[in-house]
């Protein structure tokens, strides 16, 4: 393995830069040339590629986003688009590729592997929705960003005696809502894995109000429904003044936590090791405190994990 390409794809997540840095420095340490592919699979198809050196990744470990930028690419989903990408890799003599991203990026990595290009996928998504790995790069930072905002909303919610609904990211996986809801002391946590029970939410809010609670917090994953509409329904049913806040893309930004920097560094270095060992079609993950790798397709076939125990604990502690 002489030349390794690295790209970031799909939604960005804090810690991607730390992973890029690990790929570049680990690769150079092992005598490889590292090529940075800009704007994901789109940049691969259009040959937006340049060689990276040690200076290319100086002072980026603490930065959010991705210096390689990212994009979604419908063209790569087509056979013609993938043939263009393969031709670019052959012309530039890129022997293997590290792909950093979420589910869609992993699908692309699998396609590259099927074309005969050794490819290693590294999980970078704030949603934590790749079931084969305990954590994905960016999830911890997103949790802490949301938790900080919850603390601020709690202050004003208490002052006004309101209920506040906080909508966070998570279309199919409610991990951000679940763990920030527990850590933030939310009265209700609404996630796709469980669904929405408006009557139960209203009952809990009224129960709290009747015993003198000054405020209530509800954390809602975006995959369940809209916070604004839910707020109107709750206010009508309970008479409790309710405000809704949609956090949106603020969750994707910011300096990564120590956990995400370390996780990204370990995963990026493992990806390079695998390619040097001529092992492609692999997904890097973490179980317990151990970095591991497995077949990409097998990784994609593992369903999102749902932490029922934590959800039940959150219910108990929210009484």
UniProtKB/Swiss-Prot annotation:
Catalytic activity: beta-D-fructose 6-phosphate + ATP = beta-D-fructose 1,6-bisphosphate + ADP + H(+)
Co-factor(s): Mg(2+)
GO BP, one annotated term: fructose 6-phosphate metabolic process
EC assignment: 2.7.1.11
Amino acids binding Mg(2+): 103
Activity regulation annotation text: Allosterically activated by ADP and other diphosphonucleosides, and allosterically inhibited by phosphoenolpyruvate.
Keyword S-adenosyl-L-methionine: no
Highest taxon above the source species: Bacteria
Primary localisation category: cytoplasm
Enzyme class: transferase
Compartment annotation: Cytoplasm
GO molecular function terms listed in the Swiss-Prot or TrEMBL record: 6-phosphofructokinase activity; AMP binding; ATP binding; fructose-6-phosphate binding; identical protein binding; metal ion binding; monosaccharide binding
Residue numbers binding ADP: 21-25, 154, 185-187, 211, 213-215
Gene3D superfamilies: 3.40.50.450, Phosphofructokinase domain
Subunit structure and binding partners: Homotetramer.
Family: Belongs to the phosphofructokinase type A (PFKA) family. ATP-dependent PFK group I subfamily. Prokaryotic clade 'B1' sub-subfamily.
Identification of the protein by name: ATP-dependent 6-phosphofructokinase
């Amino acid at each position: 393995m002489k030349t390794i390409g690295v790209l970031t794809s799909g939604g960005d997540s804090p810690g991607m830069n730390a992973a890029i840095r690990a790929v570049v420095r680990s690769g150079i340490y092992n005598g490889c040339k590292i090529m940075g592919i800009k704007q994901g699979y789109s940049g691969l198809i259009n040959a937006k590629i340049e060689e990276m050196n040690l200076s290319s990744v100086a002072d980026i470990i603490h930065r959010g986003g991705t210096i390689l930028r990212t994009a979604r690419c419908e063209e790569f989903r087509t056979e013609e688009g993938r043939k263009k990408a393969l031709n670019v890799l052959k012309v530039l003599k890129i022997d293997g590729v590290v792909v950093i991203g979420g589910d869609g990026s992993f699908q692309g990595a699998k396609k590259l592997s099927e074309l005969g290009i050794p490819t290693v996928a590294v999980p970078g998504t704030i949603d934590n929705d790749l079931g084969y790995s305990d954590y994905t790069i960016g999830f911890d930072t997103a949790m802490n960003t949301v938790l900080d905002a919850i603390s601020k909303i709690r202050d004003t919610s208490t002052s006004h005696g309101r209920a506040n609904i906080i909508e966070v990211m998570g279309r199919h996986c409610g991990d951000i809502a679940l763990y920030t809801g527990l850590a933030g002391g939310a009265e209700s946590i609404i996630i796709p894995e469980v669904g929405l029970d408006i009557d139960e939410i209203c009952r809990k809010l009224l129960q709290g109000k009747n015993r003198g609670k000054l405020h209530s917090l509800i954390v809602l994953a975006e995959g369940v429904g809209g916070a604004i509409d839910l707020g109107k329904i709750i206010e009508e049913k309970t008479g409790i003044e309710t405000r809704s806040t949609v956090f949106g893309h603020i969750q994707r930004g910011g300096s990564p936590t120590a956990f995400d920097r370390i996780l990204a560094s370990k995963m990026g270095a493992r990806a390079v090791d695998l390619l040097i060992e001529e092992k492609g079609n692999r997904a890097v993950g973490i179980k317990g405190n151990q970095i591991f790798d497995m077949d990409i397709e097998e990784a994609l076939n593992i369903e999102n994990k749902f932490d029922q125990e934590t959800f039940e604990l959150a219910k108990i502690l929210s009484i």
